[in-house]
A protein has these predicted regions:
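Nucleotidyltransferase catalytic core that binds NTPs
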Residues: 1-183
Length: 183
């Protein structure tokens, strides 16, 4: 498995895959990979020629008084899990790589789905999720993106975004997989 950090390298990799007619499956993560993530990578492996996994602790989905700095960053361990599960490429960009400008474009799903549950107490969270996922979908030109049903509200937000923006990606929603201890 190859690990890259730059958008330029990612685009070159994706361009080569598309030139060869390969399908691409995408698993987006914030790292700290576990069996649930591995199951998503394995599902992507079964359905695609190429599997790209992202590890990116996204600062735009953390609000004030949410501990972005304390979020675990375990790239070496994450790379081992991703490789063992069948990923071909791990894209681990820096925040500066993903958000090069202070003023930026946002993608925001509005309406009841983003105002309840997590969205009620974290009002900018889903704007950050939608923005970074749009960037990842565009950068990887993925045919399919894999998400666990554990994140039910997030998957509904992403489904609405994909539908409303006519994105050419199929969201594959997979069953929850738990560790032996139930986590």
């Amino acid at each position: 498995m190859k690990v890259i950090h730059s958008i330029k390298e990612l685009k070159e990799y994706v361009h080569q895959c598309k030139r060869e007619g390969k399908s691409i499956g995408l698993v987006t993560t914030m790292g700290a990979l576990h069996e649930g993530h591995a199951s998503l990578i394995q599902a992507a492996r079964k359905e695609n020629d190429v599997v790209i996994t992202t590890v990116f602790v996204n600062p735009t989905q953390f609000g004030p008084n949410e501990d972005y700095e304390a979020y675990p960053r375990t790239l070496d361990a994450d790379a081992k899990v991703a490789a063992a599960a069948g990923a071909d490429l791990l894209f681990a960009p820096s925040p500066a790589e993903m958000y090069p400008h202070k003023d930026m474009t946002w993608v925001e799903v509005t309406g009841p789905i983003t105002k309840v549950l997590c969205g009620r107490t974290r009002p900018i969270h889903f704007r950050g999720v939608a923005t970074v996922c749009t960037k990842f979908f565009n950068l990887t030109e993925c045919d399919r993106a894999y998400y666990g049903l554990k994140d039910a509200q997030q998957t509904q937000v992403l489904q609405r975004m994909v539908e409303d923006l006519f994105m050419n990606v199929e969201l594959r929603l997979m069953p929850i997989v738990r560790e032996a201890d139930g986590l």
